[in-house]
């Protein structure tokens, strides 16, 4: 079980990094559209929900 928790924590850290990157892109890149933000968030939510379904 400890191994599973470690893997889950690693995945959560990666998702947090991706969210931070998305936030920076959305703020700093004027060509970053709402549609792209929504698509990226949907992708991250799918990755996260895999662990809790």
From Swiss-Prot:
Purpose of the protein: No function has yet been ascribed to K protein.
Other remarks on this protein: Gene K overlaps genes B, A, and C.
The name this protein goes by in its record: K protein
């Amino acid at each position: 079980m400890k191994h599973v928790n470690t893997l889950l924590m690693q995945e959560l850290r990666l998702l947090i990094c991706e969210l931070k990157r998305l936030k920076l892109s959305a703020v700093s890149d004027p060509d970053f559209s709402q549609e792209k933000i929504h698509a990226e968030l949907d992708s991250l939510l799918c990755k996260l929900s895999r662990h809790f379904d």
